[in-house]
Amino acid sequence: MKILHIANFGFNKQGAHFYCTDRKISAGLVENGHFVYDFSFRDMARMGTIFKTKKLGASWANKEILKIVNNLEPDLVLIGHSDLMSPEVLKQIKQQYPETKIAFWYVDPLYLEHKLDFIRAFSPY
């Protein structure tokens, strides 16, 4: 299975995020025979602007996701902690590739309303 895993891999942390959940999930999927393309949303958003800020580069990172999906044609898009990702991107993915499944993982507590709002925005997809 081809999987696009969109999460916060912390590529700019020089190995400090070696044991983070997103890396463990990707490693487990690879060990089970899947091809996994890791997309570090926050790092890519920072690269998308001269000011190196996530918020200003989020639009660019969202466009990059669509380019990757067009090249990779994944069977599964797995999303974790990509709080600046646009739900519109998922809508476009489902329109272009209706067979592609979209899954979401989250490890933060759900008693905070802004966390629930984020999850609700993605739930239709």
Report each predicted region and the residues it spans.
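Extended catalytic core of nucleotide-activated donor transferases of GT-like folds
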Residues: 15, 20-28, 32, 37-125
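Nucleotide-activated donor-dependent transferases that construct or modify glycoconjugates
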Residues: 1-15
